Amino acid sequence: MLFAFGDSYADTGNTKIAVTRSWHFPYGITFPGKPSGRFSDGFVSTDFVAGYLGMKTPIPYRWRKELSGRVKYGLNFAYGGTGVFDTLVAEPNMTTQIDFLQQLINDSVYTKRVLRTSVALVSLAGNDYSYYLETNGSAAAFPGFIQSVVNQLMVNMKRIHDLGVRKIGVMSLIPLGCTPQNTAGSSFQRCNETENDLVMLHNNLLLQAVNTLNQQTNSTLFFIIDLHNAFSTVFNGTEIHQGSPTFENPFEPCCFGVTEGFFCGSVDENGGKKYTLCSNPKTKLFWDGNHPTSEGWRAIYSTPAFQNTLKQFID
């Protein structure tokens, strides 16, 4: 059984239609052929992790009553745009997402016996940091804020474990300075290395936090899914496996707003498209300004960095 917590890198349809582009064309054009609430043209990380574990993708929490027969495979509590703290998105932060699981346990939807065989995927893709910058957080205080984010993430992971979930894998931050949102200013040619340095601080603190959790529980039940090195492998064009995709400029997205202020899926008051769309998403690592294509996720999933850390779910 798989539970997912976090943000748009894991969300498979929780975020409300009114507040997100992921329910609008052209999202979902590769799979399932229409918008599904995933922030991609197709699959996202949760789908690949579930496949690796030989499980069905857990349904979104908001559909638990309509698809009650699928609840036995786990649930996805992730909401796009959220963080460990509140962000600009009025959706449940990670603490509230864990509250949802707590309530289901209280209601006997999941028993302690069942939870002992379950695992959790935790995604933190950086929305807390975007919110900090957009609300004029100071550069000098940024490292301290990163520490507070990691501290809260550590609290959240410990709580998931205390509820009975057996193993918890948390994804490291990707090189955020290399996302199309941050490379657009250089015509998708150069990464923002200042931002990447802050990412490394987060990832180093996260490693320390996971080590501390394992020491406290005298176990190896907490681990990092190495999304950072997986992305770096793909960015650098390193051979992944025979038949693995080769992407055109990895910093350039398939779908992007025509000018600043517009995004993938944006339309004007007459319904006219205000974005450009590539002819074949399989040739692009990124779908939009921040999220990989389905083929991008497949490439990331196929890297040794990702595969080797996923093994800890079943070891």
Question: Model regions: which residues?
Answer:
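Loop/turn elements at helix/coil->beta-strand transitions in domains of secreted/extracellular proteins
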Residues: 1, 56, 72-73, 115-119, ...
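Structural recognition of the beta-strand scaffold that forms the well-ordered cores
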Residues: 1-5, 9-11, 46-47, 73-79, ...
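Signal-peptide-cleavage-adjacent N-terminal segments of secreted and extracellular proteins
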Residues: 1-67, 161, 287, 295, ...
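Mobile gating loops/cap/lid regions near enzyme active sites that modulate substrate access
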Residues: 19, 175-193, 208, 212-215, ...
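Conserved SGNH/GDSL esterase-like catalytic core that processes O-acyl groups on lipids
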Residues: 25-151, 155
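Active-site rim elements
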Residues: 30-40, 85-89, 191-197, 283-294
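Sec-exported extracytoplasmic/periplasmic mature domains
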Residues: 50, 54, 102-106, 158-165, ...
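Extracytoplasmic, non-cytosolic globular domains
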Residues: 124-238
